[in-house]
Amino acid sequence: MPTTPAKNLLYRAALPILAPRSRGQMTHHTSGHPLTTLPNYERILAKHHVFGASLLLQDGANCAFCDTSTANPEHPAQENTLYRVASITKMATALVTLRCIDNGLFALDSEAASLLPDGEKAPALSGVTVRHLLCHTSGLRDLPILDDCLKEGKPYTELLRQPEIRACPPGQQLIYSNFGFGLLGCILEQQTGLCIEPLFQEMLFRPLHMRAT
């Protein structure tokens, strides 16, 4: 984890792409914060080998934005550049899950099988709770066929039927599970009656005024 205030700020506010060797170039500079001066910003990016980043700093009414890019010089990073945020989606999923719990739709220790259609027919879900899925302690592992199943649009039950999907009983080990968070998404859709995108907009993005997410 970052160990200095500058690194913490950069890691939290920017979505960087790391490269072995490269040097960022300031493509848009707005004054208002020491980090947004060209020498300071380039020094931090060069030190950590970042070649593409967007940084937004806001303190009350004062707002400063700067960005860099050498990955694709013809299309440098700008205010509206889209970034693939990958597993940051898990944080959003966790927040929406906790909001649903606060709203009484289900409980943190509700069994996942009871919240999913046909879930009771999946032995791999025996004893697995929402808490386990959130904490990566469900005992469910990511199988090599996960990506293919997603691309082919196969239901989650296809993976739950695989004998090797369960590495251990729930609560025994920490096993990072993309599939587990996918199940949380299925639970959210089933219990709210909404697809993930409008659900996230309603319960997370709009209340936070995240209009470009």
Question: Whereabouts are the PLM-identified features?
Answer:
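Short, conserved phosphate/pyrophosphate- and ester-handling motifs at nucleotide-, phospho-/glycolipid
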Residues: 90
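Short alpha-helical "switch" segments that flank and position catalytic residues
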Residues: 97
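Well-ordered alpha-helical segments within folded domains of soluble proteins
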Residues: 93-94, 180-185
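Catalytic nucleophile serine of serine hydrolases
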Residues: 87, 175-178
